[in-house]
């Protein structure tokens, strides 16, 4: 089960043109924003990654503006784990639970999740904050991740799991985000 002390939120490739062409893009972007804001309220570190940003673009303003102090971690590999800067950022934070959101579910998110699972991390893919250009690609990636030992969650499920109860100091502001 997700815990605040062990979780890192990683926003994978919510960037440039890609963010606008995936299925149900506006809903996914909105959910990513809620998740990023919730992670901030809970004190959960968040990493922004961008694959080939010089070609595809950087993290979209709707998300980047929520973390103005944070720059994209650019990479060429599909998997975030295969990039030394991302790997070092994750290792420096010394946490074992990876909460993943972004695009595309069947390429960069899938390969990242598989590599993280192989390295012994617990991987939670936030289903309402991920997408692909085709929903069939997304559903296949989710099924494969689940079969390989990953976990599926939603924005609301993850945030409320992290808080544990209504006495958490972030309960009211997170409840307001969700509504």
What role is predicted for each listed range?
Residues 1-8, 41-42, 54-179:
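Active-site-adjacent betaalpha module
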Residues 4-7, 22-48:
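A short alpha/beta connector and helix-capping loop motif
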Residues 14, 48-51, 127:
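A cross-domain feature marking catalytic cores of carbohydrate-active enzymes
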Residues 16-20:
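Short acidic, Gly/Ser-rich segments with clustered Asp/Glu that frequently serve as metal-coordination loops
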Residues 23-25, 50-51, 75-78:
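Short, flexible loop segments at the rims of nucleotide/cofactor-binding pockets, characterized by
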């Amino acid at each position: 089960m997700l815990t605040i002390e062990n979780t890192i939120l990683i926003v994978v490739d919510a960037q440039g043109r890609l963010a606008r062409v995936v299925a149900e893009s506006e809903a996914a972007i909105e959910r990513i924003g809620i998740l990023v804001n919730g992670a901030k309220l809970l004190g959960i570190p968040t990493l922004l990654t961008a694959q080939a940003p010089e070609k595809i673009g950087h993290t979209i303003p709707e998300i980047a503006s929520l973390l103005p102090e944070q720059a994209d971690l650019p990479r060429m590999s599909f998997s975030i784990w295969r990039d030394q800067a991302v790997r070092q950022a994750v290792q420096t934070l010394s946490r074992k639970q990876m909460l993943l959101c972004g695009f595309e579910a069947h390429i960069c998110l899938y390969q990242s999740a598989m590599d993280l699972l192989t390295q012994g991390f617990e991987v939670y893919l936030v289903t309402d904050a991920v997408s692909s250009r085709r929903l069939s690609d997304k559903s296949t990636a989710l099924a494969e991740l689940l079969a390989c030992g990953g976990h599926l969650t939603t924005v609301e499920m993850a945030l409320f799991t992290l808080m544990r109860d209504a006495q958490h100091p972030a309960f009211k502001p997170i409840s307001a985000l969700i509504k």
